[in-house]
Amino acid sequence: MAKGIREKIKLVSSAGTGHYYTTTKNKRTKPEKLELKKFDPVVRQHVIYKEAKIK
């Protein structure tokens, strides 16, 4: 069975709360770092989440 091209990534909150989301990303079509505006339930606001590696 072939390996998938998509890799797991972690989106970490820029608010410094430690909250994160996990998702997958196609490294071949999107080599740049991902930045999304998502809801942070700790501060109860929409903040920017930046891509980080899953350890």
From Swiss-Prot:
PROSITE patterns: RIBOSOMAL_L33
Name of the protein this chain belongs to: Large ribosomal subunit protein bL33
The organism of origin for this protein: Edwardsiella ictaluri (strain 93-146)
Gene Ontology biological process terms, A to Z: translation
Family: Belongs to the bacterial ribosomal protein bL33 family.
NCBIfam families recorded: PRK00595.1, rpmG_bact
Pfam family, one: Ribosomal_L33
A GO-annotated cellular component: cytosolic large ribosomal subunit
Keyword Oxidoreductase belongs to the record: no
Entry GO MF terms: structural constituent of ribosome
Lineage: Bacteria, Pseudomonadati, Pseudomonadota, Gammaproteobacteria, Enterobacterales
Keywords from the UniProt entry: Ribonucleoprotein, Ribosomal protein
